[in-house]
Amino acid sequence: MSEKINNLDNKTKGLIYILIFGLFLAITNTLLKSAGHIPVAEKTVYRNGICAIAGFIAVTKAYGFKDKSRYFGNKQNILGLSIRTICGILGITANLYALQYLILSTASVLQDLSVFFVVIFSFIFLREKIRLWQIVLICVGFLGALVVINPTSVKFAIAPALAAIFGAAMNGGDAVSMRFLGKKASPSTVVFFYNFVSAIILTPFMLMDYKVLSLHTTIFLILAGLCYIVVEFAMVSAYKYAPGREIAIFSYVDVVFSAALGFIVFGTFPKVTAIIGYVIIIAAAILLVLYNFKIKENTSNQKHTA
């Protein structure tokens, strides 16, 4: 399969990888949800620990074993790596908690609110300008979230909904930290550092509330970890081969996959109001992404003209 992909043009490669990312993200979440109500720390250690092994192999293969900075960072990138790890730990903890109580597609679409938090955090921490249209689209996105969680419903669960939104905020912080890192760290270093450090930090919490796992639960968690390896490297590969503006729209396909898997595996399907909310969030997110790329292109053209 890799040989066939290599024969394609870069844009097509990027599109294929972003679709693989969306599919395996949905599969990972399905497996984690199927594992049942076990402590979040335990789920995270399994998933991230397995991915850390893959990251270690990738770093060692690319740079050899002697250069420790390729594994644990250096003065130039340790701050960005640490911020990314903190946001990642908080984000995955919140997202896994939400995943246990919300239907799969709802948890996925609320995670996609992260694109709005990227703009907010970039304005606060990176001093990037925020324009009126961006503010409007952010408000529309959060309105869509309100429609999805439907606080007037009898079945409204405030804690999982807030956890999903908080997880999206942390995912946004994760993305901003990656922008702060820029080219200061290789993708394999970022993957290894986050997954290894987060697994180490969460291990004591796992041991304090350790739950003996059944065989099928263990298998689900191991498979989730293996699928998450594909998620991490597919995303990196997608943006390596194609500009973000050409493939970012397709990153929201995970919601479609999640809805399908949720129906097939759990027999759940979102209500009409929730689907309307999904459409509002995804439409606002796509417009925001396209608008951001338009701003970058205009800024770049102005610099070249000057």
Label each region the model flagged:
Residues 1-42, 154-180, 300-306:
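Glycine-/small-residue-enriched transmembrane alpha-helix faces in small-molecule transporters
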Residues 23-27, 31, 82-97, 147, ...:
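Hydrophobic alpha-helical transmembrane segments of multi-pass membrane transport proteins
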Residues 95-97, 114-136, 256-275:
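C-terminal transmembrane-helix exit sites in multi-pass transporters
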Residues 133-150, 273-292:
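Hydrophobic transmembrane alpha-helices of multi-pass small-molecule transport proteins
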